[in-house]
Amino acid sequence: MPLDRQWIEQHIPHKGRMCLLDEVLSWDAARIRCRSATHRSADNPLRLHGRLGAACAIEYAAQAMAVHGALVAASAPLASTVSTSVRGSIGSTVGYLASVRNVSLHVARLDDLEADLIAAAERVTGDGRTVLYEFSVWSAQQPLVSGRASVVLDATFGLPSVNTGTHA
């Protein structure tokens, strides 16, 4: 089964032009590497005033993290028999990028790079609710952006329920 753009779109929340990754190059339980050429596209949805700033590479890395979560969840030993709510705790629910830290931008923009982007993420630690990744994005062996990201896998966990009914 090729882990191409079509597969990626079926397994992450972003569709159409907002799906920024073209293929998974490699992955295992701890890390992933993905390729993309969408930074050169004039209709890239992250472009502003005709430019794609380097900070947008964080979104490329975040999508790689989402793909990694989907792959890990799908490869779990009981993935086909585990309930959706339990499977969600190992990566198949929608995750939310909660924070990024120690971000280093080594270039000003991405759209002027001729070579494809490589987005890589490595799981540092995590549990059923949050995951900490180290990420990097580079092009033609040139580092572009790196940092750490916290991903919340179940954003509703631990929040009080909200009563939306009317008051008398």
Walk through the language-model features, giving the residues of each.
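RNA-interacting cores
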Residues: P2-E9, S36-T38, L48-L52, S146, ...
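Short aromatic-glycine motifs in intrinsically disordered, low-complexity regions
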Residues: R5-K15, R87-G91
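Catalytic strand-loop segment that frames the active site of acyl-thioester-processing enzymes
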Residues: G16-G53
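Intrinsic-disorder/low-complexity, polar/charged segments enriched in Ser/Thr/Lys/Arg/Asp/Glu/Gln
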Residues: C19, R31-R33, D116-I118, T130-L132, ...
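Hydrophobic beta-sheet segments that form the core/acyl-binding groove
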Residues: V24, V100-A140
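Compact, glycine-rich, soluble single-domain proteins
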Residues: L48-H68
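Hydrophobic beta-strand-centered segment that forms part of the acyl-chain substrate-binding groove
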Residues: V67-I118
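Mixed-charge, glycine-accented linear interaction segment located at domain edges/termini
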Residues: V124-A168
